[in-house]
A protein has these predicted regions:
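Generic structural signal for hydrophobic core residues of well-folded globular domains
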Residues: 19, 55-56, 81, 258
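Non-catalytic recognition/regulatory regions in large multidomain proteins
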Residues: 2-5, 28-30, 64-267
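Short, amphipathic alpha-helical interface elements at domain boundaries
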Residues: 1-53, 59-73
Length: 267
């Protein structure tokens, strides 16, 4: 891992603006501080300029020549960040931060941790580092599971699980075996502990900064005290959603698969 920098949303927005991408910068700033008037925005940017100077990111020589007043390596970093065409996004419901991994070029990727929509930390990594980066980010328990557990749901039942009050309806439209009912109860207990929300790892393709990113793949999962529940889509005709309690080893295999899929975009 090759650390790049840590900055605030305002600092990142100014760096992106100076690099010629005001539209992208606007989105970064508004995600942190909300919509502002032009006068308020100018005041924020003036203060932020002083912060960039203090951090020695500002290049007076470049400014005196009428060029972008940023060090060359910072300009290269911003260009890679804004123009990245592939991104892995790792949600973390239990924390106030999120991990994103942007593809830069060839086997070079960049981790991007956003803390409370305010602090941004960046580092360059290799594609082969992606599985371990994600594994360490989540740091799920390595305790072994007591027994195999799984159940199947229809697409409708899976969608209904986003709301606690739909449990009875999910049971009504599902045909659980006694073993699946027991697994479903265990899953619901873990879902309750996680605020009734699943985690996910998503792969996005962003062919143009003028367009919204395209979701290419997504995996849903949920940590348990022992093991990790993983959602998998199958070719079952009526209940294609399979929810299975994975061992930590299976979780690591899944992340290796994420790494392999990421490596395929290098070519």
């Amino acid at each position: 891992m090759d650390y790049i920098m840590t900055c605030t949303s305002a600092e990142l927005a100014l760096l992106v603006t100076l690099s010629g991408y005001p539209g992208v910068a606007k989105g970064i700033a508004e995600a942190s501080v909300g919509e502002k008037s032009q006068k308020e925005w100018e005041a924020i940017m003036e203060v932020t300029t002083h912060q960039l100077i203090l951090k020695q990111l500002w290049d007076d020589d470049q400014e005196s020549k009428g060029e972008i007043p940023l060090k060359v390596e910072i300009q290269q970093f911003i260009q890679g960040y804004v123009k990245s065409k592939w991104m892995i996004r790792c949600s973390n419901k239990g924390q106030s931060n999120i991990l994103m991994v942007h593809h830069i070029e060839n086997d070079t990727w960049m981790t991007h941790i956003i803390d409370r929509d305010i602090i941004h930390e960046f580092a360059y990594i290799k594609g082969t580092d992606i599985p371990s980066i994600i594994r360490n980010y989540y740091s799920f328990s390595e305790k072994g599971i007591d027994r195999a557990q799984h159940f199947h749901l229809s697409d409708q039942a899976f969608d209904l699980l986003s709301e606690r009050h739909n449990i009875r309806k999910v049971r009504k439209i599902s045909s659980f075996t006694p073993e699946e009912e027991q697994s479903f109860r265990a899953f619901l207990n873990d879902l309750e502990l996680q605020g009734w929300s699943l985690y996910n790892i998503s792969l996005f393709h962003n062919p143009s900064i003028e367009r919204d990113p395209i979701l290419e793949n997504i995996v849903f999962f949920l940590p348990a005290a022992k093991g990790i529940w993983v959602v998998e889509y199958t070719d079952h005709p009526t209940a294609p959603v399979r929810v299975e309690l994975n061992t930590f080893e299976q979780w690591c295999d899944l992340l290796s698969g994420v790494g392999l899929e990421a490596s395929s975009v290098n070519s």
